[in-house]
Amino acid sequence: MTVAEQQPQHQGYANPGTPGSVVTFKKRYDNFIGGQWVPPVKGQYFDNASPVDGKVFTQAARSTAEDVELALDAAHRAAPAWGRTSVTERSNILLKIADRMEQNLEMLAVAETWDNGKPVRETLAADLPLAIDHFRYFAGCIRAQEGGLSQIDDSTVAYHFHEPLGVVGQIIPWNFPLLMGVWKLAPALAAGNAVVLKPAEQTPASIMVLMELIADLLPEGVVNVVNGFGLEAGKPLASSPRIAKIAFTGETNTGRLIMGYAADNLIPVTLELGGKSPNIFFDDVMMEDDAFLDKAVEGMVMFALNQGEVCTCPSRALIQESIYDRFMERAVQRVEAITMGHPLDPGTMIGAQASTEQLDKILSYLDIGRAEGAEVLTGGERGQREGLEEGFYVKPTIFKGHNKMRIFQEEIFGPVLAAATFKDEAEALELANDTLYGLGAGLWTRDISRAYRMGRGIQAGRVWTNCYHVYPAHAAFGGYKQSGIGRENHRMMLDHYQQTKNLLVSYSPNKMGFF
């Protein structure tokens, strides 16, 4: 079924709050502070509309600095005891959270889809299973983590202990609200920290559904969630002298501000920022008409996953010129077969953009691409569906152009692919690295030696080789250049939420002899 052939009806999950639905949102969400639901100090709330139909379905607390202070109070009360809790107990709590989420997977998946707009087939098969696995992974990591001992001499020993930072701040994005929340919560909690977390104002609801679900599993104050807008709630959190670390995922310009706040307080920062990821296809992918070629075509179409709202979206396709026409013909056919429909229909392959602001931004870049002279190969317009006319939909779009165009250089964060050709390996590497960003990249070839050379040469924190958009818990993720600082995932993430205590102990009764 093509985008143009959609039928208005859908067979899938019932809309939240309707008969048969697996989830019902509250009419209004307060902040989650100290294990309690606490109204915002100033009594203000903001409307939250679903991208699916553009209609308001709940309200969230419009928090201010006063609410952030209440959350920090609760976190500081909880942090000492939580930090002293045995790694076994912390690990077991994370495992219980994972089990609870798994038992309620459909409820969380539908909540995430309604809040964000992404297809429920993605939340069911990717977002939630990955989030669950991240809790289990870090539950295992903290049990396996060991300190160190160095024998300086026969009577002097250096002991090294991992200690939590204390209270940390976390600000998560709107493209994967639950998964990005878990990416930050799991290692921070495993390491023994208390957390104050601020969700994106575009998606404030699904994380609150999660907190309702797991609140009884956590000691009061260990996790605190404060909703609100960036300047009103995010800035007071990021700039607070009462946090020992700030972790942020979002756009690069905001990341610069966050880093400035952290510098003022001399605290560590983890930033996962923007990207303009190249996806490179060498001519040997078409040597055979086989499963690998089919996989490579799918790899190019991955730009449409999550409606293109992924920091590592493979938004630049670089295709060796000798195969461009043949390869692109297959890719366009695959894109035009994408099913756009109701996000709660398991058959829907692409859903709604997360907000009306993001919709407008994407549509503006479609105009920019045309104005630059790029050729529209497919898509290029807003998606329309009967019954969801007010939803935030965009048809997956492929432009053909060159790497100096704005659509190749600026992060669009939508289902928009900019494709260009290259002659040889050297040009492919030059084009791939001709960007301010360096978060991710894709590489497709049957030549493993070339794959290694290119993978080492590409300036990006992750280079997917003959795959794309795979996010296992035990693979480090983070950016080069203006795509960020620090890493997410992998056991090394524990180090980002801990500090090393060295006890240098002399067992000798004898003085040193200097005085």
UniProtKB/Swiss-Prot annotation:
Its EC number is 1.2.1.3. Keywords: NAD, Oxidoreductase. It is an enzyme of class 1 (oxidoreductase). One of its GO terms (molecular function) is aldehyde dehydrogenase (NAD+) activity. Pfam families: Aldedh. InterPro entries: Ald_DH/histidinol_DH, Ald_DH_C, Ald_DH_CS_CYS, Ald_DH_CS_GLU, Ald_DH_N, Aldehyde_DH_dom. It comes from the Bacteria. Belongs to the aldehyde dehydrogenase family. This is Aldehyde dehydrogenase.
